[in-house]
Amino acid sequence: MKKVCFVLVLILTLFMLCSCGRYVKSYSATILITSCQGNEASMEFDTFKGTNNFKLRRDGIAEHTLDFEASLAEGEMNVYIGVDGEKELLLTVKGGESYDETITLDDKYDNEKTIYIILETIDKCVDGDFEFEYN
């Protein structure tokens, strides 16, 4: 009986560890500063290569928009929106470009209280600043 209970606990623990996150963070960076609180997130770095994500939540009445500010000196970064383990490309930021936009989200995100913003490099990125607000 003890062995059966031990095996069940082990299987349950393994299942919980494997199903915790839907999106993976894997990167190398120098001077990386991140913040994620409620419906706002930001990331600033000197150099960055890899993938990072932020979980944004909104409360109350929704405008279904994403305020987005970004600048990048060198490299190329894809910005995705993720829901339920799937991701959709919002835009690509290339070196020398900067954005200050409000993006109206598709109808399929109307009922979503939580979204993920996924930042994924194509090339090594230098001197980047990204800010998001989910409304």
Name the predicted role of every residue range:
Residues 61, 71-76, 123-125:
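Short proline/glycine-enriched turn/loop motifs at strand-loop junctions of beta-rich domains
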Residues 120-135:
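Edge beta-strands of jelly-roll/beta-sandwich modules across compartments, strongly enriched
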